[in-house]
């Protein structure tokens, strides 16, 4: 699956005819390229008691960049029936007392805060891929839709400017590609320029603001920025929010 190849660094060989490949399959392939280092760990390796009839496996992959860190969790259900399980922070190597923003990569769905533990459903013969990012006091990156690892390969740097209340960064992808960057903040913040060119939604779970920033790669690098303001302040009138 794209999830397994995306979270692992092993070589990938393709036997497809790229000229006849369905666009949807081609998009999946692009989400596992380029290849990234480090292997995921089996989070349930020493706790699994039924390896014959219960084919449910959990993998974790902590990712660290100079600009930030997050944890990926892939849950594979190879059973022919749906399964429900409990994700535990300790199992994933995370602090049980810390709140994390939780995002479902394949469903493109923000799942609110994760703290300590949470029950999840996994469809039959399927998998779910979650990204956990420690909650910050300012807007931050939630995910991207360009790579399974959601920032390790395609986000070169991210910077929050407290004085200017601006989140900015550099994205890298092949020229001609398109993608989306997902940002998140608590309800104390709002985008400063009437959401120009972006999609903005408010979570019903925790009132968090989720912003989808479209990126178009005319060459292999895009520099972007989004200006914010306190949610109780009047909006700014006119200025580009993304460069």
Q: What is each model feature region?
A:
Residues 98-117, 191-215:
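Solvent-exposed beta-strand/loop surfaces of large extracellular or lumenal domains
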Residues 171-175, 187, 228-232:
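Beta-strand elements of well-folded, non-transmembrane domains
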Residues 68-72, 82, 117-119, 162-168, ...:
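A generic structural signal for beta-strand entry/edge sites
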